[in-house]
């Protein structure tokens, strides 16, 4: 299993983020919003947004990002070929790591279900 979060797995440019937001497909969780869009490559890619406006302190922003990246790293082989942007809500500050992991896992599971549903139609 890969340990890092290399460039090939990341969404990097503003244009890519805008394209995903424009697709208007999202799943809402308690601590995160997950935006997604099918991509042309064979694997999923991730972008994480934890803005100063929602998550004030850098320590909190880094923790929120770290939880998302780690969960993605573990589950990326099971995820469908989507570009995924995870946006941290202000409520994520009050959650402990266990709650954050549970929330992001639930969102990734819902994404897998939706992709299976849309591919069978």
UniProtKB/Swiss-Prot annotation:
State which Enzyme Commission number(s) the record gives. 3.1.26.5
Q: Name one GO molecular function term.
A: ribonuclease P activity
Reactions catalysed: Endonucleolytic cleavage of RNA, removing 5'-extranucleotides from tRNA precursor
Keyword annotations from UniProtKB, A to Z: Endonuclease, Hydrolase, Nuclease, RNA-binding, tRNA processing
Enzyme type, top EC level: hydrolase
PANTHER family recorded:
RIBONUCLEASE P PROTEIN COMPONENT (PTHR33992:SF1)
Q: What functional role does this protein have?
A: RNaseP catalyzes the removal of the 5'-leader sequence from pre-tRNA to produce the mature 5'-terminus. It can also cleave other RNA substrates such as 4.5S RNA. The protein component plays an auxiliary but essential role in vivo by binding to the 5'-leader sequence and broadening the substrate specificity of the ribozyme.
Family per similarity comment: Belongs to the RnpA family.
Q: How does it assemble?
A: Consists of a catalytic RNA component (M1 or rnpB) and a protein subunit.
Q: What is this protein called?
A: Ribonuclease P protein component
